């Protein structure tokens, strides 16, 4: 079936070993990269066209170790140095922010003197004026979910070149534009969600279709990410003899996460009670992280993945209904320091070890998995890598929560565009890590992307003197935090989308059923319950559909932003290309998903929980996607450019 080849393709020397031994093999390989790279003389020829290497007697200095920094040729095969990829990516992303990001801000118009929705509608719950760093922390930790780790590693079966190109082009010209555009449109429209903006500029019918689409999409996110988190927190793993063995890393990371939630609430209360400067807040946050980390390592909490499903759902309920300042904002603020530590660990690990990209550069336009299923570069690559390139979910965060806390319009570029390019950098680091541990040009088989990424970065941290147990627990905690911080945001957004879907628009008192459906507690329970049912099939069976729906959402949001920009007399032509590409990609992907599920039932291998649920959701997404796209495009064509209130 469509998408399965991506997760199954690839083989390696570590295949066949017990799970923990495979992880330790990767860690030993990464840990030894630095010393191996510094002492090894390459007998392959240096490509003269890339004279970039330096030489120095001190071989310990990472840039000067008698090593060509761009390409080496071994047995006629050219291998790229990961340091060059990292430097090119960093330069491209920084250039995109400084040049294209500022161009968009200047073209659309920023008014630093305007009162933002956070002040106009301040209520202490959703509308809360916050500092630039606090809003950035919320935006980044919410959007930097499992995607920038999961997507590039799964898509690496096509080769590192197409993955890198899509990350950079998508991140700068697709994803960051959408994130910033959604934040901009929402702030200019009283902090309204994309659905309500569609109602204002396109019509109520378009808003209803879009709200339903968004709600269905949040169910997929809840299902996929809950399954990932519960699997990561699983306190048990299969031993070689088939019995259950204790998984300390997962159990300790789970305890830290639970303590982390309590610490976030304490931190939120302290922020509410005392006016802390940014420096004091940062020190307090890092101190709390250290205490929670130390306690969690001493008190591992052993539960099964099924039990963790219920714990995660209980947390999501609380996060969905509590005031922003009490849980989500402080949690995201604390999480950002941890994620930045992870990114810096990976960044400096690549900087000092600069391993070769052992992945093949390009494996062709079609790859075949071990089971014989085929995945095509188009559209698979573009829906497998969502977060890190372009993700419709980001627009829901931008317009659903971040826009209500921006205290100055000039912060929007840093929050919207800046958070996205940082996430793209995380995607590039994920690609480099899987490239470093690849064997014979292929992705290590038998391990999840999270396990590959965690083991790789933990190996880098060990080479810097961090104890093995601490490095592994820290990375397990980080990758679970990636999914958890997106989960709490999407649970809140899903609840709000459900409420918008049944919002009362008549005069007088709303009927009882409508009051019930717009009640935040009822809406949260319904959303989480259906998300839980979908997660029972495992994230592997939801991911392909999630990616396609995510990208379709991005296409619909880009069209909606274009309508808003045109209606308000702002330039919008720069959105035509990305929205057209995403429409082609997503409809192709979802149609292929439907075909694959139908074939599974025809062959007698399909099950209702997996294939049946996917088929139902996919058909709904196609119908709703067509309705929203047609409605928005008609309005875009018919709208006369003018100057509206916003």
Predicted regions and their residues:
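Extracellular loop-to-transmembrane helix junctions
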Residues: 81-98, 155-186, 195, 254-260, ...
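Extracellular/periplasmic helix-exit of transmembrane alpha-helices
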Residues: 350-367, 421-456, 489
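Membrane-helix boundary/coupling elements in multi-pass transport proteins
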Residues: 146-153, 170-178, 182, 186-190, ...
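Loop-to-transmembrane helix boundary motifs in multi-pass membrane proteins
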Residues: 204-219, 418-424, 471, 500-536
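Membrane-interface "cap" regions at the ends of multi-pass membrane proteins
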Residues: 78, 95-149, 336, 376, ...
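Hydrophobic alpha-helical segments and their helix-loop junctions in multi-pass secondary transporters
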Residues: 268-273, 287-310, 318-320, 325, ...
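Flexible loop linkers connecting adjacent transmembrane helices
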Residues: 102-128, 154, 164, 168, ...
């Amino acid at each position: 079936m469509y998408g399965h080849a991506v997760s199954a393709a690839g083989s390696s020397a570590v295949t066949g070993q017990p799970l923990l031994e495979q992880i330790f093999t990767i860690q030993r390989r990464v840990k030894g990269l630095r010393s191996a790279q510094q002492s090894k003389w390459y007998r392959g020829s240096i490509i003269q066209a890339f004279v970039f290497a330096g030489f120095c007697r001190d071989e310990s200095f990472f840039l000067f170790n008698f090593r060509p920094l761009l390409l080496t040729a071994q047995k006629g095969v050219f291998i790229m140095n990961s340091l060059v990829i990292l430097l090119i990516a960093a330069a491209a992303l920084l250039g995109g922010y400084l040049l294209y990001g500022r161009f968009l801000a200047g073209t659309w118009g920023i008014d630093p003197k305007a009162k933002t929705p956070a002040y106009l509608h301040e209520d202490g719950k959703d509308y809360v004026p916050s500092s630039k760093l606090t809003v950035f922390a919320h935006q980044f930790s919410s959007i930097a979910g499992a995607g920038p780790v999961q997507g590039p590693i799964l898509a690496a079966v096509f080769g590192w070149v197409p993955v890198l190109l899509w990350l950079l082009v998508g991140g700068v010209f697709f994803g960051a534009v959408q994130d910033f555009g959604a934040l901009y449109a929402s702030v200019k429209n009283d902090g309204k969600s994309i659905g309500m903006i569609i109602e204002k500029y396109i019509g109520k019918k378009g808003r209803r279709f879009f709200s339903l689409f968004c709600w269905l999409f949040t169910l997929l996110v809840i299902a996929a990410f809950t399954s990932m988190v519960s699997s990561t927190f699983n306190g048990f793993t299969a031993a070689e003899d088939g019995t259950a063995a204790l998984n300390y890393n997962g159990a300790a990371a789970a305890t830290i996460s639970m303590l982390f939630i309590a610490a976030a609430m304490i931190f939120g209360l302290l922020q509410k009670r005392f006016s802390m400067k940014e420096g004091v807040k940062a020190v307090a946050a890092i101190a709390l992280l250290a205490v929670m980390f130390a306690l969690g390592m001493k008190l591992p909490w052993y539960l099964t993945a099924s039990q963790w499903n219920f714990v995660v759902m209980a947390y999501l309920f609380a996060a969905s209904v509590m005031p922003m300042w009490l849980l989500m904002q402080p949690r995201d603020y604390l999480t950002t320091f941890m994620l930045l530590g992870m990114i810096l660990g990976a960044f400096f690990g690549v900087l000092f070890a600069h391993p070769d990209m052992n992945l093949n550069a390009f494996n062709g336009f079609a790859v075949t998995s071990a089971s014989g299923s085929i995945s095509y570069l188009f559209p698979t690559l573009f829906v497998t890598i969502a977060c890190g390139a372009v993700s419709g979910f980001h627009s829901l965060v931008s317009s659903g929560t971040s826009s209500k806390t921006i205290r100055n319009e000039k912060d929007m570029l840093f929050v919207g565009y800046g958070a996205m390019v940082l996430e793209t950098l995380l995607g590039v680091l994920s690609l480099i890590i899987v490239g470093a541990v690849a064997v014979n040009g292929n992705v290590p088989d038998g391990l999840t992307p999270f396990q590959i990424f965690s083991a790789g970065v933990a190996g880098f941290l060990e080479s810097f003197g961090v104890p093995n147990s601490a490095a592994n627990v820290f990375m397990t905690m980080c990758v679970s935090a990636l999914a958890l911080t997106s989960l709490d945001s999407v649970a809140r957004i899903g609840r709000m989308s459900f409420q918008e879907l049944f919002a009362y628009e008549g005069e007088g008192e709303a009927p009882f059923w409508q009051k019930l459906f717009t009640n935040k507690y009822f809406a949260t329970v319904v959303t989480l319950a259906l998300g839980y049912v979908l997660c029972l099939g495992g994230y592997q069976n939801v991911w392909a559909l999630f990616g396609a729906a995510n990208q379709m959402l991005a296409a619909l949001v880009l069209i909606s932003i274009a309508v808003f920009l045109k209606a308000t007399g702002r330039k919008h032509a720069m959105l035509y290309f990305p929205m057209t590409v995403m429409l082609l990609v997503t409809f192709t992907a979802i149609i292929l998903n439907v075909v694959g599920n139908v074939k599974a039932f025809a062959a007698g291998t399909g099950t209702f929980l997996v294939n049946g649920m996917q088929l139902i959701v996919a058909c709904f997404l196609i119908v709703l996607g067509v309705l929203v796209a047609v409605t928005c495009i008609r309005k875009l064509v018919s709208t006369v450019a003018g100057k509206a209130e916003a």
